[in-house]
Design a protein with these regions (language model features):
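N-terminal glycine-rich FAD/FM-binding segment characteristic of electron-transfer flavoproteins
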Residues: 1-254
């Protein structure tokens, strides 16, 4: 059987979470196809074709997919889903927005945030803020899955040689509109992918004291995180937040 992995990218570069999701897909199916949907994203499709374990890249280039609107992408996935036994995406903000729509369109139950694959229909996922692990079994013909990427090692981005198949599938649901991006720029590693994280809590007392963490973070090449208490106190923005209600991380040093 064949798995379809939904790639995460910004129309110029593939996100690392895609590589971890492919590892999860390899535990389910013998063949893996990777969907690259976007606008002017040919470079993403070309880099996707070199990923280890991917046999085919489905490349769809249209303005309707430029901003990864879940309403449009979910229709695309539904229309190409017939050949797949499982459809996987990273459990990122985009993945969590997209995959429930896909599951609804296919009339199946989504399997959320898996951390291990026991068999082709049985999975583990954390519950109760990660304090327990649930084992879940799906009887649906098509499995729609989001993957906790920190639980799976990434595949190599360079050792593959996949076919690129360009599709002319264009879908505009007409019910949502992209307004703008508000991006926080930083020279530090992305929190969810960082090997080293320095995190502050309520004990930092105020936002200015978080500046004290920057020097050592720069020396270590670390990302800076924060507890929910620090975020709720207004010390730092919520994109710093680590944990169940924030970002899921798996650094080598915390």
């Amino acid at each position: 059987m064949t798995a379809l992995v939904i790639s995460e990218h910004d129309n110029s570069e593939l996100k690392g979470a895609t590589l971890n999701t492919i590892t999860a897909a390899q535990k389910l199916d013998d063949e893996i196809h990777l969907l690259v949907a976007g606008s002017n994203c040919n470079s993403v499709a070309e880099s996707a074709a070199t990923i280890e374990g991917v046999s085919k890249v489905l490349y769809v280039d249209s303005p309707e997919y430029e901003n990864f609107l879940a309403e449009n992408i979910s229709l695309l996935i539904k229309n190409i889903s017939n050949d797949y036994s499982s459809i996987l995406a990273p459990a990122t903000t985009n993945g969590k927005n997209l995959m429930p729509r896909v599951a609804a369109l296919l009339d199946v139950a989504q399997i959320s945030d898996i951390s291990a694959v026991e068999s082709k229909d049985t999975f583990q996922r954390p519950i109760y803020a990660g304090n327990c692990i649930a084992t879940v079994k799906s009887s649906d013909e098509v499995k729609v899955i989001t993957v906790r990427t920190t639980a799976f090692d990434p595949v190599s981005p360079e050792s593959g040689s996949a076919e690129i198949l360009k599709l002319e599938e264009v879908n505009d649901a007409g019910i949502s509109q992209f307004i703008k991006d508000e991006l926080a720029e930083s020279d530090r590693p992305e929190l969810t992918a960082a090997d080293v994280i320095i995190s502050g809590g309520r004990g930092m007392q105020n936002g200015e004291n978080f500046n004290l963490l920057e020097g050592i973070a720069d020396k270590l090449g670390a990302a800076i995180g924060a507890s929910r208490a620090a975020v709720d106190s207004g010390f730092v923005p919520n994109d710093y937040q680590v944990g169940q209600t924030g970002k899921i991380v798996a650094p080598n040093l915390y």
